[in-house]
Amino acid sequence: MKAGRSAFSRRHSGRNFASAVAFYFRGKDLGIAHEGENSAICLKTSMSIHSTAIISPNAQIFPGCEIGPYCVVGDGVVLGEGCWLQHHVSLSGPTIVGKWNQFFSFASVGQRTQDLKYAAEPTHLEIGDGNTFREFVTVNRGTSPGAKTLVGSRNHFLAYCHIAHDCVVGNDVIFSNNGTLAGHVTVEDHVILGGFTAVHQFCRIGKFAMTGGCSKIVQDVPPFMIADGNPARIRGINKVGLERHGFAAENLRHLKEAYRILYRSDLNVGQAVEQIRAELPDNPELEHLIEFVTRSPRGIIK
């Protein structure tokens, strides 16, 4: 399963956007809330929409949402239960937003891609539950017809971060201020992106990896590793981060030995993988590391 691919996306991958949304809302007690010029489709439950907010009649808003002053919720936006928009937030569609997401002032989410070959085809953005989008964060939709940008759940995107078209971001990640993803980047679960990190298009960052501030990422960052520098280099395993997530000491030793074989020997990647398989016991972390480095179109950072 791809990192960040939401349950909604997996369940409705064979449907077009409109039918998928209709299927998602089946059986739910939807009503039409007519408040002046606001005729957004809303659940028959209390919510707070500021009088200066502009809500498209084609937006769908679930209960418990709070939409602050001068926010804009556009056509094709589905806003899940309990979402909070501070003020001057812009949500554009087609975009599906899950539950309990927070959008701080001047976040712009769901705008069309900045890819110059985009020709106004219908593309999508899907966001999971419990994410935080701080001030001036931008997230773009996909580029090709039917393409999606996917963001998982429980992520924290600090001020001025950017997620470009067709990216896939997993769960429980932290992007420090001004972290930037170019198009088609994949970020797996539990990644920490240092402030001002810039990631080249089509790169991948493996789970539990971390990048230092101002890092320039032009190839894949293997899982469990720390990358730092311009251009970035692998500095070792993310020992402190892995300990905080409860990794056993034995597993840390195995990952450290795998790092030594990959980065402190004269072996190429294929030879290093063979040696890791021969010398170290099977475990899920090493299997994921091996799969990641052997399926790396751009190659891994050395």
Walk through the language-model features, giving the residues of each:
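Structural signal for interior beta-strand "rungs" in well-ordered beta-sheet cores
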Residues: 48-228, 232-233
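Terminal amphipathic alpha-helical/low-complexity segments used for targeting or macromolecular assembly
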Residues: 5-8, 17-18, 22-52, 57-58, ...
